[in-house]
Amino acid sequence: SALVGSQKAFTFKMRKEIHRNLGAYMTPQVAYMQTLGIETMSIRFERQAATCLELAKELQKLENIESVNYTGLPGNPYYDISTSQFGPLPGAMLTFNLASREACFAFMNKLKLIRRATNLFDNKTLAIHPASTIYGTFTEQQRVAMDVDSKTIRLSVGLETGNDLLTDIKQALP
């Protein structure tokens, strides 16, 4: 009886999660749009990854940014592994640290071009504060154990130009 009850609870939770995250089913329009997106995915990814590398290099030069984490930067501890597996453009996501959690929120509130959202690999550049979103349900102690810093901003770089993104970041920095 307890096993059946726990299976029902699990099934209910999975249905709830799947419906919330993916919807009940894919409509023909969504299927069509995904087909179109797949055709240009390699071109978009190459542009996004190149922009991400450019942006990471520029962010390292800014005084208000304490550190930049991008596996495509030569100083990154995972640089050799990353470039051997993915080549010179290892992805379109980077993180950087500001002075404090409060500085992160002030920064996010001032963004104009970059959107605040938790998606990945969008055509638009997206920023989140992982400690309060993805890891928001964990205690501070748990986040520290997982090496999740409350001073970190995550960017998933889109198709905008690196110059436009850098301009938005600079104007938003505290």
Task: Give residue spans per PLM region.
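PLP-dependent enzyme catalytic core of the Aspartate aminotransferase-like
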Residues: E102, A127-P174
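Active-site C-terminal subdomain of aminotransferase-like
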Residues: A2-M93, N97-S132
